[in-house]
UniProtKB/Swiss-Prot annotation:
<dbReference type="Pfam" id="PF01118">
    <property type="entry name" value="Semialdhyde_dh"/>
</dbReference>
<keyword id="KW-0963">Cytoplasm</keyword>
<dbReference type="InterPro" id="IPR036291">
    <property type="entry name" value="NAD(P)-bd_dom_sf"/>
</dbReference>
<dbReference type="GO" id="GO:0006526">
    <property type="term" value="P:L-arginine biosynthetic process"/>
</dbReference>
<dbReference type="GO" id="GO:0003942">
    <property type="term" value="F:N-acetyl-gamma-glutamyl-phosphate reductase activity"/>
</dbReference>
<dbReference type="GO" id="GO:0070401">
    <property type="term" value="F:NADP+ binding"/>
</dbReference>
<keyword id="KW-0560">Oxidoreductase</keyword>
<keyword id="KW-0521">NADP</keyword>
<dbReference type="GO" id="GO:0051287">
    <property type="term" value="F:NAD binding"/>
</dbReference>
<dbReference type="Pfam" id="PF22698">
    <property type="entry name" value="Semialdhyde_dhC_1"/>
</dbReference>
<comment type="function">
    <text>Catalyzes the NADPH-dependent reduction of N-acetyl-5-glutamyl phosphate to yield N-acetyl-L-glutamate 5-semialdehyde.</text>
</comment>
<protein>
    <recommendedName>
        <fullName>N-acetyl-gamma-glutamyl-phosphate reductase</fullName>
        <ecNumber>1.2.1.38</ecNumber>
    </recommendedName>
</protein>
<dbReference type="GO" id="GO:0005737">
    <property type="term" value="C:cytoplasm"/>
</dbReference>
<keyword id="KW-0055">Arginine biosynthesis</keyword>
<dbReference type="InterPro" id="IPR023013">
    <property type="entry name" value="AGPR_AS"/>
</dbReference>
<dbReference type="InterPro" id="IPR000534">
    <property type="entry name" value="Semialdehyde_DH_NAD-bd"/>
</dbReference>
<comment type="similarity">
    <text>Belongs to the NAGSA dehydrogenase family. Type 1 subfamily.</text>
</comment>
Length: 322
């Protein structure tokens, strides 16, 4: 059994990660660290886990007792932890924050998008889990980059559910504001753009165009629905072939020949992609569950690869809407 520890156990991504690991046939949770909830039952915070666990939060860190450590912490906290603690040399780490997503000589974290860096992830000791928007958008663009087709700016509009804002309440997460409402935020300046560009340039070194990304807040709890537009004269049939070929060995990305919707992916680790041509414009529709394929599900996917397990173990999930 893979023995796992979690630091930062009170948020939405942590709750989903706990649920996945509790039901993972090859994993045992040793501890869930949360200084603000130490001593409390996990179900005091994650009430959807009633009947599934008797675990309690702890402020202890028995790092020598685990094989893999997940960070579900606020941005900046993982880096502080790594700099201030003696982490066992052979301990595998999966960081769900954005601290190590950008390549640097200062760290050895692999960018953990399996559809891009599968081979590197399989041998990695430290993995940086991608952002939710970044995952959805990259999966819509990677086959084009692989075929050197990103020669102009990319237009992206993507809407996310309220869980994307985290568990702490804010002015834009209250039900009375969010319900029956929509708004944009961080237009052209979202923090996930640099990691998207980094990945595209990894496949297409000549890529130097803009990602014109406008994020939207949706009035639903979870999921990301993105539309991407690029210009190309290549026929749709050839583009579909490129996408199917690129994702042929990936278990969670599926090219769908009819229009898609968010309910098809919520509560799964899938990404569905639909392609259309309108004149010289290619429309790419990509959708994921922000908490699973965009966070905790992808983290478990990375764990499976790091421990040489079949990649779908513990992740064969049914959409919650059907």
């Amino acid at each position: 059994m893979i023995k796992a520890g979690i630091i930062g156990g009170a948020g939405y991504t942590a709750g989903e990660l706990i649920r996945l690991l509790l039901n993972h046939p090859e994993t045992e949770i040793v501890f869930i660290n949360s200084s603000s909830n130490a001593g409390n039952r996990i179900t005091d915070v994650h009430e959807g886990l009633y009947g599934e666990t008797d675990l309690r939060f702890t402020d202890q860190l028995p790092l020598d007792a685990i094989d893999v450590l997940f960070f579900c912490t606020a941005h900046g906290d993982t880096k502080k932890f790594m700099e201030s603690h003696n982490v066992p040399e052979d301990l595998k780490i999966i960081d769900l924050s954005m601290d190590y997503r950008i390549k640097s000589d200062d760290h050895d974290f692999i960018y953990g998008l399996p559809e891009l860096n599968r081979r590197a992830t399989c041998t990695a000791k430290h993995v940086a889990n991608p952002g939710c928007f970044a995952t959805c958008i990259q999966l819509g663009l990677l086959p084009l980059a692989k075929n050197l087709m990103l020669t102009g700016d990319v237009s992206v509009n993507a809407i996310t559910g309220s869980t994307g804002a985290g568990v702490k309440p804010g002015a834009t997460s209250h039900f009375s504001w969010r319900n029956n409402n929509i708004s944009i935020y961080k237009a052209f300046d979202h923090q996930h753009v640099p990691e998207i560009k980094q990945s595209l340039k990894q496949l297409q070194n000549s890529f130097d165009s803009e990602i014109d990304f406008i994020p939207y807040r949706g009035d639903f709890p979870r999921g990301i629905f993105a539309t991407l537009v690029v210009k190309t004269k290549v026929a749709l049939e050839e583009i579909v072939r490129m996408y199917e070929e690129y994702y042929a060995k990936d278990s969670f990305v599926h090219i769908v020949d009819k229009n898609i919707d968010l309910k098809q992916v919520v509560n799964t680790n899938k990404c569905l992609i639909h392609l259309e041509k309108h004149g010289d414009k290619l429309l790419i529709i990509s959708c994921i569950d922000n908490l699973l394929k965009g966070a905790s599900g992808q983290a478990v996917h990375n764990m499976n690869l790091m421990f040489n397990l079949e990649e779908t173990v513990g992740l064969r999930l049914k959409p919650s809407a059907f």
